[in-house]
């Protein structure tokens, strides 16, 4: 996600609400990577702080990090995971395999509900 993305600013609090109310106590872990585009690390810190997004792991991926990877011949996360838009939601299983990708918050909730019922 991108801390300057208007859509991300709408989606992340909704995602956090679903997570804290339904998924966290079910043992689901959530991990977010904020990718620097037009904003800064301070924009990211401010948004995470204002929205109190503390119940899950937040990581900041700077332009310098991305440049360093590319210059080292290592694809950036956007290339590795085909991230074209922000935010991009992926679901991984307990073995960290991607089981669903590019979901909305509602689709994520639906998939998790189906998975929970199948257990």
Task: Name these PLM-found stretches.
Residues 51-57:
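Structural recognition of alpha->loop->beta junctions
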Residues 1-3, 33-36, 61-63:
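Active-site-proximal beta-strand/loop segments in catalytic clefts of secreted hydrolases
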Residues 30, 58-59:
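Conserved beta-strand scaffold positions in the cores of enzyme catalytic domains, especially
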Residues 9-51, 66-76:
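Structural microenvironment flanking redox-active thiols in thiol-disulfide oxidoreductases
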Residues 3-6, 53, 63-116:
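Thiol/disulfide oxidoreductase modules built on the thioredoxin-like
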